[in-house]
């Protein structure tokens, strides 16, 4: 009888353990059988993102933009459209991006820029690698790891999905 009680107790204990993982249906790695979210949800970076915060070399430059939107496409290309405060003509950049499998590092390679001044797209090769501090369904928060842009030592960016 004691063995049966011990066996039933062990079964009850094991059966009461909740499965951990990602229980957010908006995440790429959603698991409907998960009872307790353990913070491992991975979200798609694809879509349209609007700038919320831009800190360059310690200076908050967010308000220097009237508009700043980045479109990230499924073929790993992107298009950035931004309008400086007081200007009436958008500047566009395009290139490619890579997000690593663990969603901790995002790299951009700018390939072209268009000042929309009648001269069309011009080569502009620039690379940025960011540490992804947070990527949710609605928010992207990242910090610069490296770039080949002279005089840029730090960048903090927060964007919201639109």
Predicted segments, located by residue:
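Secondary-structure capping and domain/repeat boundary segments
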Residues: 71-76
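Bacterial N-terminal signal peptides
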Residues: 7-12
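Contiguous, well-ordered beta-strand patches that form the walls/edges
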Residues: 56-60, 77-143
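A short beta-loop-beta micro-motif enriched in histidine and acidic residues
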Residues: 65
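Primarily marks secretory-pathway-exposed extracellular/lumenal segments that are disulfide-
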Residues: 5-6, 18-50, 57, 69, ...
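C-terminal motif of bacterial Sec signal peptides marking the signal peptidase cleavage site
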Residues: 14-16
């Amino acid at each position: 009888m004691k063995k049966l009680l011990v066996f039933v107790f062990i079964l009850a204990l094991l059966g009461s353990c909740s499965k951990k993982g990602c229980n957010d249906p908006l995440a790429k790695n959603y698991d409907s059988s998960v009872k307790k979210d353990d913070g491992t949800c991975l979200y798609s970076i694809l879509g349209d993102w609007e700038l919320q915060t831009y800190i360059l070399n310690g200076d908050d430059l967010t308000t220097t933009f009237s508009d700043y939107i980045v479109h990230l496409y499924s073929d790993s290309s992107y298009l950035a459209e931004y309008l400086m405060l007081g200007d009436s003509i958008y500047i566009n950049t395009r290139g490619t991006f890579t997000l690593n499998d663990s969603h901790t590092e995002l790299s951009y390679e700018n390939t072209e820029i268009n000042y929309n001044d009648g001269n069309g797209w011009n080569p502009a090769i620039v690379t940025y690698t960011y540490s992804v501090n947070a990527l949710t369904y609605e928010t992207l928060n990242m910090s610069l790891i490296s770039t080949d842009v002279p005089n840029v030592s730090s960048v903090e960016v927060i964007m919201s999905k639109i």
